[in-house]
Each structure stands twice: as C-alpha cells, then as structure tokens.
C-alpha cells in the first residue's frame, strides 16, 4: 500500500471564526497559526499548503499579561535615514487593533512562500461584524 501524500488542490479548506475578546494575545496566536498551517488535520504535511481560513473578531479587545500593555513596543522603519518609529501596545491596539494580531500570527508562521500563502488566509476585524457569511464559517471556542 502506498503512502498517502496530501495535495493542496484536493484538500477542502474550511472557514473558522475565533472570538478574540478577553483572550491572551500569544495563546490566541498559537491557535490561529495552528489552523492556518493545517496541523489540526490528519493529512498534515509540512511541504503542502493544506491549512484553513481563519476569521478573528473583536481584535480591539485582546489582552496581554503582566506589564506588556505599557512595556511591549512595536518598531517599524519608514525607509528614510533615522526613520525608525515605535509604538507601545496600548497605542497600537487603539490605532491599529488588527495589526497586533496579524504581527503576532505572522511571526509564528513558516518563513518563505508557503508561509506567505498561509498568512493570506487570515482575516482580522476589530469589531464583531465580518463579511464572510457566505462561506458559512464554523465557530471555534478556545480557552486561553
């Protein structure tokens, strides 16, 4: 009997919804990345893109533990000399609540073309309204 090898065009991708309200950022991000990579499926293979789509709601209400609300700093560079900018978590969650979860999840995905394809299946919304009702997403309840 031959070994089954998963192919990305054969595997059906499903849509999942995760509510981020009062969830810890790191623990939430590990669950999201697990579904994007496809490790929850029995057909998982590290060289094949078989992960699912993930919709994250209420990104504005995600929490962090300890003093990270004030101490965690996000850096970016404008491209100009001396153009390094920084925002702490509190300001970042007020200005760009979706980016906080996107940055955390992107760091947990594989680097390279396969990881970029996985990252494209992540949808993050600051409120509890999304535009993906036609895909009939399944709700995932996580404890973290």
Curated annotation (Swiss-Prot):
Listed under GO biological process in this entry are: negative regulation of translation; translation
Family, similarity comment: Belongs to the universal ribosomal protein uL13 family.
Residue stretches in coiled coil: none
Under what name is this protein listed? Large ribosomal subunit protein uL13
* InterPro entries assigned: Ribosomal_uL13, Ribosomal_uL13_bac-type, Ribosomal_uL13_CS, Ribosomal_uL13_sf
Q: Name one GO cellular component term.
A: cytosolic large ribosomal subunit
- PROSITE patterns assigned to the protein according to its UniProt record, in alphabetical order: RIBOSOMAL_L13
């Amino acid at each position: 009997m031959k070994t089954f090898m998963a192919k990305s065009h054969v595997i059906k991708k499903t849509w999942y919804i995760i509510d981020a309200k009062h969830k810890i950022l790191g623990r939430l991000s590990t669950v999201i990345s697990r579904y994007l990579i496809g490790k929850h499926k029995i057909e998982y293979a590290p060289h094949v893109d078989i992960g699912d789509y993930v919709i994250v709601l209420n990104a504005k209400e995600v929490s962090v533990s300890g003093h990270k609300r004030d101490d965690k700093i996000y850096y970016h560079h404008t491209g100009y000399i001396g153009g390094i900018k920084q925002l702490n978590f509190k300001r970042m969650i007020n200005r760009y609540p979706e980016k906080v979860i996107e940055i955390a999840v992107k760091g947990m995905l594989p680097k390279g073309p396969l990881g970029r394809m996985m990252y494209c299946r992540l949808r993050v919304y600051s409120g509890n309204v999304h535009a993906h009702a036609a895909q009939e997403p399944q709700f995932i309840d996580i404890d973290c």
